Amino acid sequence: MNDLVNLLDLDADALTAYCGELGEKPFRARQLQRWIHQFGASRFDAMSDLAKSLREKLATRAEIRSPAAITDNLSADGTRKWLLDVGNGNAVETVYIPEETRGTLCVSSQAGCAVNCRFCSTGKQGFSRNLTTGEIIGQLWMAEFAMREQLGRGPKDDRVISNVVMMGMGEPLLNYDAVVPAMRLMLDDNAYGLSRRRVTLSTSGVVPMMDRLSKDLPVALAVSLHASNDALRDVLVPLNKKYPLAELMAACRRYLEFAPRDFITFEYCMLDGVNDGVEHARELLKLVADVPCKFNLIPFNPFPESGLKRSNNDQIRRFAQVLMDAGIVTTIRKTRGDDIDAACGQLAGEVKDRTRLAERGKFGKITPLVPVAATGQAGEARPA
């Protein structure tokens, strides 16, 4: 059994408390945090300004460990996707998306997902477990320093990753106690120093936790809407049966009182013949009439056995035009990295399926598809 404390699990307050338990003053925690999150150090003996006595204590009591990479794939368009091992046959996905003025990392919060949206590959896997704070922030830690090795730092010695979206596998608000400390580290100037406007949490609409987040750590909010009425959303997003649209819209209005942005982003997956009619767009206008918002229309990314099809481009444009004619800012998400993956969650689902087969004796051992050595500082092997 591993009794070492993973320091990636600790935000600033928790790290200060831990150093106090070791008999160290608070400034040592700040030094340690900088080494980990600003410089990507994974070895205590590399932390040259820490007292030797502290380094020796840490070497026997603590570790810095992020999930190990099973695969690491780079698309022709610059998108980079990691499949990360979180144990017991479970894997999660992390994606870096380059754009002209920013680099965005899409982070997972759970292995699997209990919400089970009709169009989501992750939901079809079922729910395995919540990720720890260290497994969540570890995705940013791993990706930032991997991207620095690939691209170098920016012209002003900037970080490569300027934005984080909690839009990967899982429902973040159903893993609140691990997600919030991870986001605190993202915002901490002594760690990643992102602004609240540059960290976006996406939720399917867990209303009580939206209210809690608005008071604890109001970051930018995206809501997975995907339907214009309750009858349709009950089918596409089963959580709607618990928190119907009227409650969700009221929660969005309350959140805006605290939000760093003056609008909510509504995500809407475009499904051919299901939710993509002009009548659905007009119904949306009534639904969001008193919620300052923008829409992000997402072409459906097909996966096996979904039984759904992507709306064609002309239909997506017609749908978008209805919203834009009403004055709502509307974007159509570009499909990225098509040459390295399919739907979000599909690679992780393949690992889980292979694990289940192995447990039934059809495979002897689960081996990585493409073994990758993630690194911390240049030339430094990152521990598995």
From Swiss-Prot:
Swiss-Prot/TrEMBL cofactor(s): [4Fe-4S] cluster
Catalytic residues (UniProt): E93, C344
GO molecular function (one): tRNA (adenine(37)-C2)-methyltransferase activity
Substrates-to-products reaction catalysed: adenosine(2503) in 23S rRNA + 2 reduced [2Fe-2S]-[ferredoxin] + 2 S-adenosyl-L-methionine = 2-methyladenosine(2503) in 23S rRNA + 5'-deoxyadenosine + L-methionine + 2 oxidized [2Fe-2S]-[ferredoxin] + S-adenosyl-L-homocysteine; adenosine(37) in tRNA + 2 reduced [2Fe-2S]-[ferredoxin] + 2 S-adenosyl-L-methionine = 2-methyladenosine(37) in tRNA + 5'-deoxyadenosine + L-methionine + 2 oxidized [2Fe-2S]-[ferredoxin] + S-adenosyl-L-homocysteine
Subcellular compartments: Cytoplasm
Binding of S-adenosyl-L-methionine, residues: G170, E171, S202, S224, L225, H226, N301
Domain annotation Radical SAM core: ranges: 99-339
InterPro entries with a match to the protein in the record: Aldolase_TIM, Methyltransferase_A, RlmN_N, RNA_MTrfase_RlmN, rRNA_lsu_MTrfase_RlmN/Cfr, rSAM
Enzyme Commission number: 2.1.1.192
Note on how the cofactor is bound: Binds 1 [4Fe-4S] cluster. The cluster is coordinated with 3 cysteines and an exchangeable S-adenosyl-L-methionine.
Gene Ontology, cellular component aspect: cytoplasm
Keyword Calcium annotated: no
UniProt-listed GO biological process terms: rRNA base methylation; tRNA methylation
Family statement: Belongs to the radical SAM superfamily. RlmN family.
More details: Reaction proceeds by a ping-pong mechanism involving intermediate methylation of a conserved cysteine residue.
NCBIfam families listed in its UniProt record: rRNA_mod_RlmN (TIGR00048)
Record's function text: Specifically methylates position 2 of adenine 2503 in 23S rRNA and position 2 of adenine 37 in tRNAs. m2A2503 modification seems to play a crucial role in the proofreading step occurring at the peptidyl transferase center and thus would serve to optimize ribosomal fidelity.
Protein name in the entry: Dual-specificity RNA methyltransferase RlmN
Organism from which the protein derives: Cupriavidus pinatubonensis (strain JMP 134 / LMG 1197)
Lineage, top ranks: Bacteria, Pseudomonadati, Pseudomonadota, Betaproteobacteria, Burkholderiales
GN (gene name): rlmN
